[in-house]
Amino acid sequence: MTAKRLTKEDIRNAPILNPVDHVVLAFDNDEVTSQAVDALRATGFADQDILAYSAAEATPRLQERVRAASGAAGFGYEIVLMRRYLSYAEQGAGWMIVYAPDDAAVQRIVDVAKRFNAKCAVRYHRLANEDLI
């Protein structure tokens, strides 16, 4: 069963970041992120498949998510990822959340992530997350 393609509104309103059937990527800065977005479009991804975020846009939300994490979440992989993402955001990283409902889409994302030296690429499954690079 494939999860639905998320919007920025979905992400903003979600209490936790768990975008099933999506890949979260961070790049050195907003300019590199923009170049990676163009490269993904060139491989066949549609505009609605790609949610791009600037560091300025992502940092406050990540700070809030880390701050609001419950004590139990502090020991899970979810909070480890949030802290990693926050660290990258505070260093000026640009972000993407890309809809990837199948392995072929994921491979195209990984190829672009490697070409643009992504800091991270994490695929979200229903019950687990997968570091892709």
For the regions a language model picked out, list residue spans one by one:
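Positively charged, small/polar-rich N-terminal and surface patches that mediate targeting and assembly
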Residues: 1-133
